Design a protein with these regions (language model features):
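N-terminal amphipathic/basic-hydrophobic helices that include classical n-h-c signal peptides
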Residues: 1-21
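A short glycine-rich, His/Asp/Glu-containing loop-to-beta-strand
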Residues: 34-69, 124
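Short, conserved beta-strand element in jelly-roll/cupin
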Residues: 59-60, 72-88
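Ligand-binding loop in jelly-roll beta-barrel domains
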Residues: 107-132
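Short, charged/polar surface micro-motifs in flexible loops or helix N-caps
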Residues: 52-53, 60-65, 83-86, 94, ...
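Short acidic-glycine-tyrosine-enriched beta hairpin
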Residues: 92-107
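Short strand-coil-strand connectors
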Residues: 50, 89-93, 116
Length: 136
């Protein structure tokens, strides 16, 4: 298989029909990913392989007075703060994060964020992939 053929299997694959990008090998430009609104002032960009998912989340509705409602999921999560500042709540712990900081969330642990600046960009990674994100 050539690099051109392998670059974006999603363009012809079933997951592409659900507006998501599955990457087998190669590169993916943000301009090639369909932005997905996930609430007022929030946009998600998804890419995934068979077992790993990455979500770039742009929050443009900060700062917020209160944290978002906590949630949990059976996936492992590692997140990287690209820009902005936020509080992250994981279980009973609260930490202020800035660009370059990271946080990890074990499966099934309640967690959430509170935006401290107008714009925050996170890169979230999940294993296994979050199938619920693909069916929306």
């Amino acid at each position: 298989m050539s690099i051109e053929d392998a670059s974006f299997i999603a363009k012809a694959g079933t997951r592409a029909k659900r507006r998501k990008q599955e990457v087998e090998m190669g590169t993916l430009k943000q301009s090639e990913i369909t932005p997905e609104p996930i609430g007022e002032g929030r946009t998600r960009y998804l890419a995934h392989t068979e077992k790993l998912m990455m979500a770039v989340i742009d929050f443009r509705d900060g700062p917020t007075r209160e944290p978002d409602p906590p949630h949990s999921h059976p996936h492992e999560q590692i997140s990287y703060v690209v820009s902005g500042e936020l509080l992250v709540f994981i279980g009973d712990e609260q930490t202020r994060l800035e660009p370059g900081d990271m946080f990890t969330v074990p499966p099934d642990i309640p967690h959430t964020v509170q935006l401290l600046t107008e714009h925050v960009r996170l890169v979230d990674t999940f294993h296994p992939i979050r199938d619920a994100f693909l069916s929306k």
